[in-house]
Amino acid sequence: MKYILVTGGVISGVGKGVIASSFGTLLKSCGLDVTSIKIDPYINIDAGTFSPYEHGEVYVLDDGAEVDLDLGNYERFLDVTLHRDNNITTGKIYKLVIEKERTGEYLGKTVQVVPHITDAIQEWVERVAQTPVQGSSKPQVCIVELGGTIGDIEGMPFVEAFRQFQFRVKRENFCLAHVSLVPLPKATGEPKTKPTQSSVRELRGCGLSPDLIVCRSEKPIGLEVKEKISNFCHVGPDQVICIHDLNSIYHVPLLMEQNGVIEYLNERLQLNIDMSKRTKCLQQWRDLARRTETVRREVCIAVVGKYTKFTDSYASVVKALQHAALAVNRKLELVFIESCLLEEETLHSEPSKYHKEWQKLCDSHGILVPGGFGSRGMEGKIRACQWARENQKPLLGICLGLQAAVIEFARNKLGLKDANTTEIDPNTANALVIDMPEHHTGQLGGTMRLGKRITVFSDGPSVIRQLYGNPKSVQERHRHRYEVNPKYVHLLEEQGMRFVGTDVDKTRMEIIELSGHPYFVATQYHPEYLSRPLKPSPPFLGLILASVDRLNQYIQRGCRLSPRQLSDASSDEEDSVVGLAGATKSLSSLKIPITPTNGISKSCNGSISTSDSEGACGGVDPTNGHK
């Protein structure tokens, strides 16, 4: 087993996750099986109770683990399935050691950070490194990312553990890559290497010497700066890798390859890579990177959320939208709308913000209402669902988005004006959304319906089922504590809301569709967690297709995208969507009202453009493996 440890210096958020994932992508392109471990030096057991504003999105794995969003990067980059033990926290390690002490495994010894905590860390890494993450084959390389920066007091036990670990596994099996910031002050206009020198000096003071120094910078770094870092940090020039800010993170593995990373790792770790038998993985990366640069036509999607001030709160949602947009040859234009600003209260308190946010919503080509918790902004989500339903605007609701759509429908189609969720109003007379008793234990951490579960499709035609490839059931990841009240299902269906997916017991509603609407779909599960660049999530793909008036064409072709067209850059002069040529019927024949009551133009002014997305070494599968 080979190990690559990725550490960071100077500042956090310097890009260790992308660098670590890129190492894995390069090695996987050489035919090696790769796994990843993320170490978070906080005392929390997991990320389940984190505020989205503080830590970003909580990513959910197949086994129900709530983990750091970097594990989502690993899964998307490498197209693997990770497990709860692939995320190590200080809380998990201390809990493990304390439990061993309580059962007498330390035979009455004084339990200390060294050796007990450090030994537990090393044993955990060795055990998880042997766990298969793709098929049944054991990984050959394990990439470990240590969160935070060198010098943080929280991370010192882990640094000491890896100081010992390098001797435990021998030098030829251990490589350390240190990611450091090279700032470019405007006052001087030249890169400064002192922060990197200090960071490497501190790392060496802990007993670890970097084999590779990855320099992150705003602009490309000149050869003289690279040589200076080489001289003062005691590494060869070929061991200094310069990664500047790029238009797309698709380019990061390619830039690392150009810097000779594969050749260095092959020699340093004795990987015995046959360079003449490289797989087509990196060629797929090059194709994807080229397409992100050449696609010009835009699709504008409004994300009506509660945590829009910090876009990492919706990291997987954004990536899933990017994957779907790229699949249909569109550049994604994202507009983040704070849901509370759509509420009537804002009209009276801040009318300018109210009208501005509603203008953004009306100008978009499609709407996405993501998940969330709590009462703040819920009425804004409900109003967004109402506008999309009444104005034939394509909409995808996720988790809380489904619940908002159901409540809105009950209020305005069933006449139940007090319809609500017990999360917000426990005493409501018409509880359309209720909590699940078995998941309501009084605690918050780890008490939700989590992980991959089966959703069974109902009989009869369904747009979302066709998008998945017409299977009888699919498996998707969940994270929720509330569900649609089954007592109201028949009343909702009588008015045109179709529950086309349920759990295996047919008691929990998983998917809704609206009859006579271009695309009004909502899911209780989170489809964004299983989206991949070459395998876009079907619900997201449906939203993008409907937003560009191509959904009917896609369905007529049997919901298939051409592998060649997915991998090759397409001309923006083409009027057809990638993989959809030959279809005859378009949603443009529908009379869709696009002008709201307050008269808004059909542009995406004031929106946020984004085109970064991950790549994977997998094949093309329009059903995204949901079989």
Curated annotation (Swiss-Prot):
Residues 300-554 form the Glutamine amidotransferase type-1 domain. Pathway: Pyrimidine metabolism; CTP biosynthesis via de novo pathway; CTP from UDP: step 2/2. It comes from the Eukaryota. GO terms for molecular function: ATP binding; CTP synthase activity; identical protein binding. GO terms for biological process: 'de novo' CTP biosynthetic process; CTP biosynthetic process; larval lymph gland hemopoiesis; pyrimidine nucleobase biosynthetic process. Residues 599-627 are annotated as: Disordered. Pfam families: CTP_synth_N, GATase. The keyword Ligase applies. The active site is at C399 (for gatase activity), H526 (for gatase activity), E528 (for gatase activity). Keywords: ATP-binding, Cytoplasm, Glutamine amidotransferase, Ligase, Nucleotide-binding, Phosphoprotein, Pyrimidine biosynthesis. Disruption phenotype: Larval lethal. NCBIfam families: PRK05380.1 (NF003792), PyrG (TIGR00337). Catalyzes the ATP-dependent amination of UTP to CTP with either L-glutamine or ammonia as the source of nitrogen. Constitutes the rate-limiting enzyme in the synthesis of cytosine nucleotides. This is CTP synthase. It comes from Drosophila melanogaster (Fruit fly). The gene is Ctps.
